[in-house]
Swiss-Prot record:
Pfam name, any one: EF-hand_7
GO cellular component: muscle myosin complex
Keywords annotated in UniProt: Motor protein, Muscle protein, Myosin, Repeat
Organism of this sequence: Drosophila mauritiana
Primary gene name: Mlc1
Subunit structure: Myosin is a hexamer of 2 heavy chains and 4 light chains.
Residue span(s) of domain EF-hand: 7-42
The protein's name in its UniProt record: Myosin light chain alkali
Record-level Gene Ontology MF annotations: calcium ion binding
InterPro entries, per database record: CALM/Myosin/TropC-like, EF-hand-dom_pair, EF_hand_dom
């Protein structure tokens, strides 16, 4: 796909900032999971778990993850589903 169709890093970050209530570059892992399941390309639970395993830093004690690293990893090495 063309880059325009896939979106760019800044577009993804702007969308995820909507969930960043503390404005500190983190969001709840559960909110990211919900967004991936409910919005955009429809992914199933197994696909979301694969994304998290491949691209995600561990969540902190309060359940937050740094979303910019997730997007960077996802875009630099896309996960392909059959």
């Amino acid at each position: 796909k063309k880059e325009k169709e896939q979106g760019c890093y800044e577009d993804f970050i702007e969308c995820l900032k909507l969930y960043d209530k503390e404005e500190n570059g983190t969001m709840m892992l559960a909110e990211l999971q919900h967004a991936l399941l409910a919005l955009g390309e429809s992914l199933d639970d197994e696909q979301v778990e694969t994304l998290f395993a491949d691209c995600m830093d561990p969540e902190d004690d309060e359940g937050f993850i740094p979303y910019s690293q997730f997007v960077q990893r996802l875009m630099s090495d896309p996960v392909v589903f059959d």
